[in-house]
UniProtKB/Swiss-Prot annotation:
Recorded name of the encoding gene: obg
Domain Obg: residue ranges: 1-159
GO biological process terms held by the UniProt record: ribosome biogenesis
Residue segments, region Disordered: 128-150
Top-level class of the enzyme under EC nomenclature: hydrolase
Organism encoding this protein: Legionella pneumophila (strain Corby)
Upper taxonomic lineage: Bacteria, Pseudomonadati, Pseudomonadota, Gammaproteobacteria, Legionellales
UniProt family annotation: Belongs to the TRAFAC class OBG-HflX-like GTPase superfamily. OBG GTPase family.
PANTHER family linked: DEVELOPMENTALLY REGULATED GTP-BINDING PROTEIN-RELATED, MITOCHONDRIAL RIBOSOME-ASSOCIATED GTPASE 2
Positions of transmembrane segments: none
Keyword tags: Cytoplasm, GTP-binding, Hydrolase, Magnesium, Metal-binding, Nucleotide-binding
Superkingdom assignment: Bacteria
HAMAP family for the chain: GTPase_Obg (MF_01454)
Protein name: GTPase Obg
Domain OBG-type G residues, every copy: 160-334
Stored CDD domains: Obg
Length: 341
């Protein structure tokens, strides 16, 4: 299925039903009083997160959503039927913005919890409501009010505990395949990953976390180059970022310069991302079989980046070092969630 993480739609809540103008006209009550009933409220529009959805593609084909209008009141003091509410299912992690003002209306991250987006119109009042001691035959009613109408911008931000950063072909997709049940596409060319992918990493029968793989970044991504700039927003909800570096690139490029280019793109896009815990993952150590050469390369990268946080040396394709990495991630995530509780 095509991955779509942005959509523009219009929603319109139902109009309230009009109040009824009516008088009792029965065989033995020739001059009966007013009996016009109120209208029904218009249907409201709710958004609800569903774990079964992972893309906004449905909103590319259906762009207008309208709730049911309330029915008008009737004689005999009968109230009009309320318009049926409309509940729109969206993926977990959907942000709902007012497209005209840019205001964030809702961050829908709890499955099964309806969130009101557009309020239905209020019902009109029948003439019975206006009966008084000085006005026994009121001919006054009120119409139902219009429901709220909004132009919306939907933005999906995937919910993941761990985000993978790196240049194309750094081995991010290979890593997520190695440690989870994800079937991310892997090939020996840049931009194999075209949209964010999620993998559930299970470290024990009762402990797991979610890892997100986004398309590789290139220099100038913050200004729109490559593919990754569209998906940097998906890293905003993560607890920790893994900076994946190819320790022995086949094109002979400098891993330190490559890593600095990625950090520069993060700084330009959103400096707050740099405040998250970031661990360095040096991948493809299998490409340097000589232990001394490998250790010298690792130390030169750490020194060149002036890296102070945790460093893991792994071979994703051979799953070397991946278990230790996953256990350390689970421990950090547990600690962060406990501190937030």
């Amino acid at each position: 299925m095509k991955f779509v993480d942005e959509a523009l739609i219009k929603v319109e809540a139902g109009k309230g039903g009009n109040g009824c103008l009516s008088f009792r006209r029965e065989k033995f009550i020739p001059r009966g009083g007013p009996d016009g009933g109120d209208g029904g409220d218009g249907g409201s529009i709710y958004f609800e997160a569903s774990s079964d959805l992972n893309t906004l593609i449905d909103f590319r084909y259906t762009r207008q959503y309208k709730a049911e209008n309330g029915q008008s009141g009737m004689g005999g003091n009968c109230t009009g039927k309320k318009g049926e509410d409309l509940t729109i299912k969206v993926p977990v992690g959907t942000m709902v913005y007012d497209a005209d003002t840019g205001e964030l209306l809702a961050d829908i991250s709890q499955p099964g919890v309806p969130v009101l987006i557009a309020q239905g119109g209020f019902h009109g009042l029948g003439n019975t409501r206006y009966k008084s001691s000085v006005n026994r035959s009121p001919r006054q009613t009120t119409p139902g009010s219009s429901g709220e109408s909004r132009n919306l911008r939907l933005e999906l931000r995937v919910l993941a505990d761990v985000g993978l950063l790196g240049l194309p072909n750094a081995g991010k997709s290979t890593l997520i395949r190695a440690v989870s049940s994800s079937k991310a596409k892997v090939a020996d060319y840049p931009f194999t990953t075209l949209h964010p992918g999620l993998g559930v990493v299970r470290v024990s029968p009762y402990k797991s976390f979610v890892m997100a793989d986004i398309p590789g970044l290139i220099e100038g991504a913050a200004q729109g180059a490559g593919l990754g700039h569209r998906f940097l927003k998906h890293l905003s909800r993560t607890c920790v970022l893994l900076h994946v570096i190819d320790i022995a690139p086949l094109d002979g490029s400098d891993p330190v310069a490559d890593a600095k280019a990625i950090l520069n793109e993060l700084t330009q896009y959103n400096p707050d991302l740099l405040n998250k815990p970031r661990w360095l993952v040096l991948n493809k150590i299998d490409m340097l079989p000589d232990e001394k050469e490998r250790e010298e390369k690792i130390q030169s990268i750490i020194k060149g980046l002036e890296w102070k946080d945790k460093v893991f040396s792994i071979s994703a394709i051979e799953t070397k070092g991946t278990q230790e990495l996953c256990y350390a991630l689970m421990q950090l995530i547990d600690e962060m969630k406990e501190s937030e509780a």
